[in-house]
A protein has these predicted regions:
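Short, compact, well-ordered microdomains
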Residues: 85-118
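Short N-proximal segments of mature Sec-exported proteins
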Residues: 24-86
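Sec/Tat signal peptide C-region and signal peptidase I cleavage site
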Residues: 17-23
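Bacterial N-terminal signal peptides
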Residues: 6-15
Length: 118
């Protein structure tokens, strides 16, 4: 191996941008979820809408396979956009909680919007 390879690798690793925290808060998700209902969107707004809907879809899918009592029960006829709307409605009433991770705010929002029968 040439002598310069370890130096290049060390420099590359040292200059790499630090990873963002896994989940720093819910504010960004709220911003992204404003776009699915918007008519004309820019490319960036389309990307944000897709990020929102994809995160919610993955979150709901993950919650469906967790053992134990379900924290929420979304009807099968509910669309992803309706789920995003429910999240935005909840976030509008609970702006003080948006410093919490996205998964926490989503679980609380869906627990209120889509409670399970008792």
């Amino acid at each position: 191996m040439p002598k310069w390879v370890p130096i290049v690798l060390a420099l590359a690793l040292a200059s790499a941008a630090p990873l963002e925290a896994a989940d720093v808060g819910s504010t960004e998700l709220v911003r992204q979820c404003k776009y699915p209902r918007q008519g004309k969107r820019t490319i960036d707004e389309n990307a944000d809408a897709l990020q929102c809907l994809s995160y919610i879809d993955g979150f709901v899918a993950g919650a469906s396979i967790v053992a134990g009592p379900r924290p929420f029960c979304i009807p099968a006829t509910t669309t992803l956009v309706q789920e995003a709307d429910a999240y935005l409605a909840w976030a509008g009433k609970h702006a003080d909680t948006l410093t919490q991770p996205r998964y926490v705010s989503l679980q609380r929002a869906f627990g209120e919007a889509f409670p399970c029968p008792k």
